[in-house]
């Protein structure tokens, strides 16, 4: 019997949710990226991201029996968006985006551990 893991996103790390997008002060111009996003392109994983216009975010991910939730701050620095979860959430995170790369119509995800997989796509109304 061969078993395959279809969700290789696990990379247990609570190092203040390492971000590879250097933190900068939240700029009003970043508000253009504020909105509600859904993760696409990762099998058997559901995730939502809400980037608020005030520089705060809410994030949720479910895979198998693991549910992850975080709130915190976000910023845009050049072509990347960084997320920093509040400490009460970060200490429990096993899966978390370390970087979101801004593309034309979506945010490509790099997870803790450096794996790129999936993209957050803005919800349509």
Question: Which positions does each model-derived feature cover?
Answer:
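Bacterial N-terminal signal peptides
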Residues: 1-6
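Lipid interaction determinants
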Residues: 9-125
């Amino acid at each position: 019997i061969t078993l395959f893991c279809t969700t290789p996103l696990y990379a247990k790390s609570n190092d203040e949710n390492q971000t590879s997008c250097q933190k900068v002060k939240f700029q009003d111009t970043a508000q253009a990226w504020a909105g509600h996003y859904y993760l696409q392109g990762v099998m058997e994983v559901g995730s939502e991201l809400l980037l608020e216009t005030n520089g705060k975010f809410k994030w949720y991910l479910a895979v198998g029996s693991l549910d992850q939730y975080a709130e915190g701050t976000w910023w845009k620095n050049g072509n990347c968006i960084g997320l920093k979860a509040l400490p009460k959430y970060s200490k429990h995170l096993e899966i978390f985006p370390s970087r979101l790369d801004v593309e034309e119509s979506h945010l490509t995800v790099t997870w803790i551990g450096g794996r790129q997989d999936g993209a957050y796509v803005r919800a349509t109304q």
